[in-house]
Amino acid sequence: MQIIPAIDLLGGSCVRLHQGDYDKVTRFSDDPVAQALQWQEQGAERLHLVDLDGARTGEPANDSAIRAITSALTIPVQLGGGVRTAERADTLLACGLDRVILGTVALEQPQLVVELADRHPGRVVVGIDARHGKVATKGWIEDSNTEATALAQRFSASAIAAIISTDISTDGTLEGPNLQALREMAEASSVPVIASGGVGCMGDLLALLTLEPLGVEAVIVGRALYDGRIDLGEARKALAESRLQDPPSDLLQDFA
């Protein structure tokens, strides 16, 4: 299972939100390029970027930082937040990003996402952010009546690379991921799932590893890395070693 460090950009700085609340911001760095290089040096195989300004307004606001990061790194970079048109996605993919993540537009214009994925196979990711099982959009500000698993099923036969499944209630809390929601998401679609939200310790990563056979292939980690609760290098090593062993029985109780 791949661990993907996250950098959330707000006003050009690296921040984390608590449960997606723009009024609950923790600022970690004013130098996103240096932060990105740090994750790469610690062994990250991919970087996850979020333009929080873009997610809230629909207008790109951190392009200079995004370009600087992609130019500085040698690992693939994926970006979400405010990517709501085919033109914007095409431009980003042509400027060095490996993948673009579409959330709001995936709910509002799913066919556009399918067509974009056909043009860029393996480079389009659908971000499904859920609150109490229902899809939330526009930077998690607006709630819909669409079930997250139902939206995932719409893209099962498409050329998208993956689905990022975020449980908003756990995001930024460090209280553990919503394993049941991730299990349901993985079972609802044949597309690989990337877990996001709630990871706070090594035990959470080991718990997620039990979902890998279902198609949960990676996990995005933010605050736990910044707070030092998880060391990226040590976590990568521990996951690699755990894959060679049977998972602890107590981690499987929820799925018996």
From Swiss-Prot:
GO CC term (a single one): cytoplasm
Enzyme class: isomerase
Molecular function via GO: 1-(5-phosphoribosyl)-5-[(5-phosphoribosylamino)methylideneamino]imidazole-4-carboxamide isomerase activity
Pfam annotation, one family: His_biosynth
UniProt cross-references to InterPro entries, sorted A to Z: Aldolase_TIM, His_biosynth, HisA_bact_arch, Isoase_HisA-like, Isoase_HisA-like_bact, RibuloseP-bd_barrel
Pathway assigned to this chain's UniProt record: Amino-acid biosynthesis; L-histidine biosynthesis; L-histidine from 5-phospho-alpha-D-ribose 1-diphosphate: step 4/9
EC number of this enzyme: 5.3.1.16
Record keyword ATP-binding present: no
Swiss-Prot/TrEMBL keywords: Amino-acid biosynthesis, Cytoplasm, Histidine biosynthesis, Isomerase
Gene designation: hisA
NCBIfam families for this protein: 1-(5-phosphoribosyl)-5-[(5-phosphoribosylamino)methylideneamino]imidazole-4-carboxamide isomerase, PRK13585.1
GO process terms (BP): L-histidine biosynthetic process; L-tryptophan biosynthetic process
Residues of the active site: D8 (proton acceptor), D129 (proton donor)
Descriptive protein name: 1-(5-phosphoribosyl)-5-[(5-phosphoribosylamino)methylideneamino] imidazole-4-carboxamide isomerase
Matches recorded under SUPFAM superfamilies: Ribulose-phoshate binding barrel (SSF51366)
UniProt KW Isomerase keyword: yes
Compartments in which it is found: Cytoplasm
Organism: Synechococcus sp. (strain WH7803)
Entries under PANTHER family matching the protein: 1-(5-PHOSPHORIBOSYL)-5-[(5-PHOSPHORIBOSYLAMINO)METHYLIDENEAMINO] IMIDAZOLE-4-CARBOXAMIDE ISOMERASE
Catalytic activity: 1-(5-phospho-beta-D-ribosyl)-5-[(5-phospho-beta-D-ribosylamino)methylideneamino]imidazole-4-carboxamide = 5-[(5-phospho-1-deoxy-D-ribulos-1-ylimino)methylamino]-1-(5-phospho-beta-D-ribosyl)imidazole-4-carboxamide
Family of the protein in this entry: Belongs to the HisA/HisF family.
